[in-house]
Amino acid sequence: MAANKGMAIGIDLGTTYSCVGVFQHGKVEIIANDQGNRTTPSYVAFTDTERLIGDAAKNQVAMNPQNTVFDAKRLIGRKFNDPVVQSDMKLWPFQVINEAGKPKVLVSYKGEKKAFYPEEISSMVLTKMKETAEAFLGHSVTNAVITVPAYFNDSQRQATKDAGVIAGLNVLRIINEPTAAAIAYGLDKGSHGERHVLIFDLGGGTFDVSILTIDDGIFEVKATAGDTHLGGEDFDNRLVSHFVEEFKRKHKKDISQNKRAVRRLRTACERAKRTLSSSTQANLEIDSLYEGIDFYTSITRARFEELCADLFRGTLEPVEKSLRDAKMDKAKIHDIVLVGGSTRIPKVQKLLQDYFNGRDLNKSINPDEAVAYGAAVQAAILMGDKSEKVQDLLLLDVAPLSLGLETAGGVMTVLIKRNSTIPTKQTQIFTTYSDNQPGVLIQVYEGERAMTRDNNLLGRFDLTGIPPAPRGVPQIEVTFDIDANGILNVTAMDKSTGKANKITITNDKGRLSKEEIERMVQEAERYKAEDEGQREKIAAKNALESYAFNMKSAVGDEGLKDKISESDKKKILDKCSEVLSWLEANQLAEKEEFDHKRKELENMCNPIITKLYQSGCTGPTCAPGYTPGRAATGPTIEEVD
């Protein structure tokens, strides 16, 4: 792979998970790994045959706990006799030894004992992140910005830099995680004068609160506080204990000593916890958990909040401490930024918001990606990316939801995709659905769902006075234009007459709040699979209807009068009418039924059309390879490919 000199990546090297991003084509891309995950476990495992990094390592931890290393970030840059190392050692299933005052991890690899420095373990994770980026970019990458907690001392920073070097990276800079998060939100741009930012970072294994002041692009850390042992894993532990007790009650058996059962339960608990951030209840189904007993149960969000109540409430203490240390009143904080996957928990957000008297929280960037996002921006700036996008990137806003209009069948046709930087302008050509249709109704929606009924209607207007023409002939040009203030102008123009109409939608009227946007985006993810099926179903229905209409009009064509026998013509027309009336009665049929009907119709029509073609027919139906085109179902307008 040839290296691309001008490209640099940003890496968030986390205690439990890591994340990598790159700035290209005017925006930051957070890069998914080979498993399709945008965050990668900071785990390295050694077996008799191989070394595993990331998801593969974490997935086998139950079978191989002594040789699966994680939490290297808790060791890096520390001495063996450091109290932190001594207390953490008691909790790890792997062995840590003392070599000349430095800690090393002892594992069995390919049948022999091997000791690794924390820098080496971290470098393996960094290598994985580097390879993830290279697979995405298609060329090798050496330049990187790596993030560390604000409280890391010089030796921890240097050790992290060394880990980068071991991984074959040229570390452009080590930057603080809270600074990266602030850069991601562009908080260093825009306002003149000093800004105070509180970064609330609740990750998988650690909790950090930082207060930064940003003045003219200069970042200063005023205070840090937190708990190096509070995070998502602690919430998982509470769930595990709860279910171990439940299993005891239901089945009179204690599973807590069975490592594999506990590990499987923990994995299910982590999944349930994530579900509870978007749903009020989660189900656990674990087959043959212990002694052949299936464990099927559920937990509500309220119960989860009760189990972790003291931990959640405890997150406010470091917030108060950091404000005291910074000698700052909470009213003086301009921005509150959420970082770390655990800040998705609604109760955590509510406690923080209530503490700051209902202030808005910055959470539009995925909280587990915000640090890598900022690191990627910083990397581009350090590489001298002079594009206006980098210089102004942090001034630019984005469209929080996709914007589009309703086309035939109630389908949402998107013109401006979610997270497009604004200002932006997109144009697409649409057409009429019925013959001699005098006008079209343009209905503007925002949302991520495939069907407009599930999205939010922003406004509608009519474009009238379209000259009579067959369906599909008029060309209606629709333009969506969002200016820098987020104001949307939608214009529709009939290209034949130049007649146009427009609507202006300002962002305060009928737009969704940040919370609703968050909720819709989460819902959309959940529904994406359903939507895909729905989209395929409508495409199949459209294809069938289109084929039937086109065959009908083709055999009714004056030019074909003498070329086709009345019986063939009747056969086609009858079959088309039968299909169209079946369609009327079966709007909600499955994709397979629509496809089956279309094949049936094609099998009947194709021999007749072929016969026509062989008899020297001319006209649209008779062009070689003719297949009636795709049209749409339903009311108003139809998309032209």
UniProtKB/Swiss-Prot annotation:
UniProt region (Nucleotide-binding domain (NBD)), positions on chain: 3-388
Annotated ATP binding sites: 14-17, 73, 204-206, 270-277, 341-344
Domain statement: The N-terminal nucleotide binding domain (NBD) (also known as the ATPase domain) is responsible for binding and hydrolyzing ATP. The C-terminal substrate-binding domain (SBD) (also known as peptide-binding domain) binds to the client/substrate proteins. The two domains are allosterically coupled so that, when ATP is bound to the NBD, the SBD binds relatively weakly to clients. When ADP is bound in the NBD, a conformational change enhances the affinity of the SBD for client proteins.
Protein's UniProt name: Heat shock 70 kDa protein 1-like
Family, as annotated: Belongs to the heat shock protein 70 family.
Lineage: superkingdom: Eukaryota
UniProt xrefs under PANTHER family: HEAT SHOCK PROTEIN 70KDA
Source species of the chain: Rattus norvegicus
One GO CC term on file: nucleus
GO biological process: binding of sperm to zona pellucida; chaperone cofactor-dependent protein refolding; positive regulation of protein targeting to mitochondrion; protein refolding
SUPFAM superfamilies tied to this protein: Actin-like ATPase domain, Heat shock protein 70kD (HSP70), C-terminal subdomain, Heat shock protein 70kD (HSP70), peptide-binding domain
One function term, GO molecular function aspect: protein folding chaperone
Complexes and interactors: Interacts with PRKN.
Keywords: ATP-binding, Chaperone, Nucleotide-binding, Stress response
Induction details: By heat shock.
Alphabetical list of NCBIfam families matching this protein: PRK00290.1
Nucleotide-binding as UniProt keyword: yes
Gene3D superfamilies named among the record's database cross-references: 1.20.1270.10, 3.30.30.30, 3.30.420.40, Actin, Chain A, domain 4, Substrate Binding Domain Of DNAk, Chain A, domain 1
One Pfam family, short name: HSP70
Function: Molecular chaperone implicated in a wide variety of cellular processes, including protection of the proteome from stress, folding and transport of newly synthesized polypeptides, activation of proteolysis of misfolded proteins and the formation and dissociation of protein complexes. Plays a pivotal role in the protein quality control system, ensuring the correct folding of proteins, the re-folding of misfolded proteins and controlling the targeting of proteins for subsequent degradation. This is achieved through cycles of ATP binding, ATP hydrolysis and ADP release, mediated by co-chaperones.
Region (Substrate-binding domain (SBD)): 396-511
